[in-house]
Amino acid sequence: AXFQKIKVANPVVELDGDEM
């Protein structure tokens, strides 16, 4: 998703992004 690129730069955001 979109959040995939953010997860690479900020691993902390992954829980608030695609994982949910």
UniProtKB/Swiss-Prot annotation:
Something else known: On the 2D-gel the determined pI of this protein is: 6.8, its MW is: 32.3 kDa.
Main location group: cytoplasm
One of the GO BP terms on file: tricarboxylic acid cycle
Organism ancestry: Eukaryota, Discoba, Heterolobosea, Tetramitia, Eutetramitia
Keyword Oxidoreductase belongs to the record: yes
EC code: 1.1.1.42
Catalytic activity: D-threo-isocitrate + NADP(+) = 2-oxoglutarate + CO2 + NADPH
GO cellular component, one term: cytoplasm
The protein's name: Isocitrate dehydrogenase [NADP]
Source species, domain of life: Eukaryota
Compartments in which it is found: Cytoplasm
Keywords for the protein's UniProt record, in alphabetical order: Cytoplasm, Magnesium, Manganese, NADP, Oxidoreductase, Tricarboxylic acid cycle
Top enzyme class: oxidoreductase
Cofactor names: Mn(2+); Mg(2+)
Sequence similarity: Belongs to the isocitrate and isopropylmalate dehydrogenases family.
